[in-house]
Swiss-Prot record:
Annotated function: Involved in the anaerobic nitrogen utilization via the assimilation of allantoin. Catalyzes the second stereospecific hydrolysis reaction (deamination) of the allantoin degradation pathway, producing S-ureidoglycolate and ammonia from S-ureidoglycine.
Primary subcellular site in the record, as a coarse category: cytoplasm
Cofactor note: Also able to use Co(2+).
Binding of substrate, residues: 196, 236, 249, 253
Organism: Escherichia coli (strain K12)
Start and end residues of each Cupin type-2 domain: 184-230
Gene: allE
GO cellular component: cytoplasm
An MF annotation (GO) of this entry: ureidoglycine aminohydrolase activity
Protein name: (S)-ureidoglycine aminohydrolase
Annotated residues for binding of Mn(2+): 196, 198, 202, 236
UniProt keywords, alphabetically: Cytoplasm, Hydrolase, Manganese, Metal-binding, Purine metabolism
Location of this chain's protein in the cell: Cytoplasm
Similarity remark: Belongs to the UGHY family.
Length: 261
């Protein structure tokens, strides 16, 4: 069901969907229900807007399929807005601050506030990317900078000392950065050490495998292609399940800032 699965038009079965939306708390968005959004600057792309302030998030996530020569040459970002791009599949060419980046699967680009990024598909076949934007929260004496690389080059961290849960950190742990992007991977049977409750929000896109996720104390099956929004203080934890393939997702997290009152 849905454009990502190429099942649209006349139905041959009951209308059904695994999606769950609890505004400000959590949401599970599945490929079956996602629709295309027309966004100025995105040409020859299928773009879906995921988390937004309308859902209760302080950020915006996108899932974008770039067809041949598709991309955004107008510029993604803006004054006071930080952005992040991750290549799920394919090859793209991205530009920012006068530099050009050839990004393949696992490639990423972070642009600090005020720096626009452009990108275009670099192959005849479709490429798919995960995009993020958020209004930057400044702190006196510190500033972020442009960061690019590939997930394959990042240090593999044993999450909380567990050999079967691997964490990748995309951005420096510096006070200039008010957010980070990570990949968390669970071997089948592995899990978080405890159910978390914290002020940070997450937007998570599942890259591989299957899992069972606790969202506000509801245990919910999830799998590759699903998207999860977790609001501040929403209970959260997950298990990897299935046979062989790791349960992995890329996710954002706000950090390094006090709470304004």
């Amino acid at each position: 069901m849905g454009y990502l699965n190429n099942v649209t038009g006349y139905r041959e079965d009951l209308l059904a969907n695994r999606a769950i939306v609890k505004h400000g708390n959590f949401a599970l968005l599945t490929p079956d229900g996602l629709v295309k959004n027309i966004i100025p600057g995105f040409e020859n792309c299928d773009a879906t807007i995921l988390s937004t302030p309308k859902l209760g998030a302080s950020f915006v996530d996108y899932l974008v399929t770039l067809h041949q020569n598709g991309g955004n040459q107008q510029g993604f970002g803006g004054e006071g807005i930080e952005t992040f791009l991750y290549v799920i599949s394919g090859n793209i060419t991205a530009k920012a601050e006068g530099k050009t980046f050839a990004l393949s699967e696992g490639g990423y680009l972070y642009c600090p506030p005020g720096s626009l990024m452009t990108f275009v598909n670099a192959q005849a076949e479709d490429s798919q990317i995960f995009l993020y934007k958020r209004r930057y929260v400044p702190v006196e004496g510190y500033a972020p900078w442009l960061v690019s690389g590939n997930a394959s080059e990042l240090e593999r961290i044993h999450y909380e000392g567990m050999d079967d849960v691997i964490l990748l950190d995309f951005l420096p742990k510096e006070l200039g950065f008010d957010m980070n992007m990570h990949i968390l991977s669970f071997a089948p049977g592995a899990s978080h050490g405890y159910i978390e409750t914290h002020v940070q929000e997450h937007g998570a896109y599942i890259l591989s495998g299957q899992g069972v996720y606790n969202l506000d104390n509801n245990w919910i099956p999830v799998k590759k292609g699903d998207y999860i929004f977790m609001g501040a203080y929403s209970l959260q934890a997950g298990y990897g399940v299935g046979r062989g393939e790791a349960f992995s997702y890329i996710y954002s997290k706000d950090c390094n800032r006090d709470v304004e009152i």
